[in-house]
């Protein structure tokens, strides 16, 4: 999920670096650890699990596309925030261009990154089935004033099983408790860990920074 949000918009800067704007995702993690110190150990456990998996499993060089079902929850306070489906489709398309490295500006990549730039072989697709097995376009709409100054509170309004879907909440504005940086938070994601609850997992992003059309 962190990777997903970097693709969208985020500035992943070190949280305690001097003269560098803090990252909302890092500050969200710091706040979680402050409220629950066990959160740090869960993060370490996940990293160790990944290291163990990589050490005991051979990595195939064969191309294999991994599909990730996505549900976009539009949380709107009024109709001006209730973005159209076309903007959602556009945002997912841009996300996939960057993940698959098919975006038209790849030739402008800085030399320092050229040796590591690659197709992630990951594709994000709007879900076609909801948690009850019913057909869906992968977009939900919920009217709530929580769209204003949103944070993890919007996740309690609606969320699909985070073990089966990537949840993205699109809101009007974001207010992270404890965020010390100037300006505004465009969006943030949760650092994943084993059995992360749905009330913490996922991405929250302003509709003005979601895609390239409509209100973006």
PLM feature spans:
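N-terminal zymogen propeptides
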Residues: 17-65, 99
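Fold-level signature of zinc-dependent metallopeptidase catalytic domains
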Residues: 50-96, 170-175, 187
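Metzincin-family zinc-dependent endopeptidase catalytic domain
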Residues: 89, 93-216
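Bacterial Sec-dependent N-terminal signal peptides
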Residues: 1-23
């Amino acid at each position: 999920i962190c990777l997903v949000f970097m693709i969208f918009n985020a500035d992943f800067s070190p949280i305690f670096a001097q003269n560098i704007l803090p990252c909302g995702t890092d500050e969200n993690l710091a706040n979680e650890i402050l409220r629950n110190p066990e959160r740090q150990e869960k993060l370490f456990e996940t990293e160790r699990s990944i290291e163990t998996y990589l050490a005991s499993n051979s990595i195939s060089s064969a191309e294999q596309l991994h599909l990730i079902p996505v549900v976009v929850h539009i949380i709107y306070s009024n109709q001006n925030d209730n973005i159209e489906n076309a903007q959602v489709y556009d945002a997912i398309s841009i996300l996939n261009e960057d993940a698959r490295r098919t975006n038209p500006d790849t030739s402008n990549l800085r030399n320092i990154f050229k040796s590591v730039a690659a197709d992630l072989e990951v594709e994000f697709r709007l879900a076609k089935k909801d948690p009850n097995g019913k057909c869906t376009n992968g977009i939900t709409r919920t009217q709530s004033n929580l769209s204003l100054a949103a944070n993890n509170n919007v996740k309690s309004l609606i969320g699909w099983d985070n073990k089966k879907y990537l949840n993205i909440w699109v809101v009007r504005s974001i207010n992270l408790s404890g965020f010390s940086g100037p300006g505004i938070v465009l969006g943030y994601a949760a650092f994943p860990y084993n059995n992360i609850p749905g009330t913490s997992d996922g991405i929250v992003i302003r509709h003005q920074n979601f895609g390239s059309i409509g209100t973006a």
